[in-house]
Amino acid sequence: MSGLYLALRTLHIVSATILFGTGLGSAFYLWMAHRSGDPRSIATVSRHVVIADFLFIAPAAVVQPLSGVALAWASGVDLLASWLVAAYVLYALAGACWVPVIRLQIRIRDLAGVAVAGSRPLPPAYRRCIAIWFALGWPAFGAFLVIFWLMVAKPDPW
């Protein structure tokens, strides 16, 4: 194995770990804050989740496909291999879920912040946002699990 291949593979694995791990951790903490019902907790956690999105998830989301294509090219894998095409589609699905989730998390942060500042309960808009956020998380999570399997198994489904 060449040094380039090992560097690309390491970059790809590390960025996948950051993307999946930070996403899962952020979802867990925001969901637990929501379950507490405490606007202060929700405001604090959602503020940190939004920061984590921009510091960790966004860069990893860019590095992931770039390092993946470079890794496939460096290892001589056909970029249109069926398992890679399936991974591309699933990655696009996860991204299509993640983009609105970013906006929802910003809205959740803002709604909770206003509730805390005004010593008021969370408004109905908060409940709508968290419900949509929760619903969008599942297909993205499932897509990433299947992508991990595709990267390891490299099956030839068609």
Please name every model-derived segment.
Residues M1-W158:
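Polytopic transmembrane helical bundles with strong interfacial aromatic enrichment
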